[in-house]
Amino acid sequence: YETFLQPTDDESVYPYLTYNNVLVWRAMKALAHLYPEQYGTLEQQAEAVRRAIYAHCVFRDAEQKPYFGWSVDLKGQHNVYDEPPGSLQLLPYYGFCAPDDEIWGNTVAMIRAPSYAYSFADAPIAEIGCAHAPYPWILSLCNSLLCGYKEQAFRELEQMEMDNGIACESVDPVLGTCTTGAAFATCAGFLCHSMKQASKEVSHAD
């Protein structure tokens, strides 16, 4: 499925976004489950979308390790990128792949690596930004809470002032103070949800 907008509402480089198509897959699965009489056939269509993602959105790096491209043109072109409002890090959370999936693991390693343009891996707030706001995003911290980096994310939360304690779009990578998007209400809601989900995992582990 084609789109010209990324999760930030910025225009995409190529027309087919991996993350957006995963959302299409998830929505079709949900509709088929909730309304089987009306939309049961969407289960087959969802599987077709899933197969298409693996067929067209997976590439290999210089070491031949597979990873998910961010956007593709179906002609072999793609870009390596991620956006905190709709991150490839959330694929296991949506049930698209397992947390130990090799392709997903390689993808996450690439976008969290110090060499990635919008990674702040070496900073106290070691989250990810994007072109829309090139600082660590609070939504990236939410993604960390949901994708296996909850210990790091909780530590970062303790260091952040944000917008006087209110969730904002992005923060300074060292100070944790608001840099863009003060009083970001939808971000605050997702942060609460992510913290709750991560806390459940901690309590179950105990």
What is each model feature region?
Residues 30-43:
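Inter-helical turn/loop segments and adjacent helix faces that build the functional surface
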Residues 78-98, 134-206:
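C-terminal capping/lid segments that line or modulate ligand- or cofactor-binding pockets
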Residues 1-25, 40-139:
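Extended ligand-binding clefts on enzyme/binding-domain cores
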Residues 28-32, 50-53, 57, 195, ...:
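A structural signal for well-ordered alpha-helices, especially hydrophobic packing surfaces
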Residues 36-37, 58, 172, 203:
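Short, flexible helix-adjacent loops and helix caps
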Residues 28, 108, 154-158:
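Inward-facing hydrophobic residues that define packing positions of alpha-helical scaffold repeats
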